[in-house]
Curated annotation (Swiss-Prot):
Keyword entries, A-Z: Thioether bond, Toxin
2'-cysteinyl-6'-hydroxytryptophan sulfoxide (Trp-Cys) crosslink location in chain: W3-C7
Cross-link Cyclopeptide (Ala-Pro) mapped to chain: A2-P8
A single MF term (Gene Ontology): toxin activity
Family: Belongs to the MSDIN fungal toxin family.
Listed name of the protein: Phallacidin proprotein 1
Function text: Toxin that belongs to the bicyclic heptapeptides called phallotoxins. Although structurally related to amatoxins, phallotoxins have a different mode of action, which is the stabilization of F-actin. Phallotoxins are poisonous when administered parenterally, but not orally because of poor absorption.
Post-translational modifications reported in the UniProt record: Processed by the macrocyclase-peptidase enzyme POPB to yield a toxic cyclic heptapeptide. POPB first removes 10 residues from the N-terminus. Conformational trapping of the remaining peptide forces the enzyme to release this intermediate rather than proceed to macrocyclization. The enzyme rebinds the remaining peptide in a different conformation and catalyzes macrocyclization of the N-terminal 7 residues.
Top-level taxon of the source organism: Eukaryota
Proregion span(s): 1, 9-23
Metal-binding listed as a keyword: no
Length: 23
């Protein structure tokens, strides 16, 4: 999501987790 980009500190980690969860 775009709101994750606002927090690069955990953007990558959260993005990976969400990507795996969504799919």
């Amino acid at each position: 999501p775009a709101w994750l980009v606002d927090c690069p500190c955990v953007g990558d980690d959260v993005n990976r987790l969400l990507t795996r969860g969504e799919r």
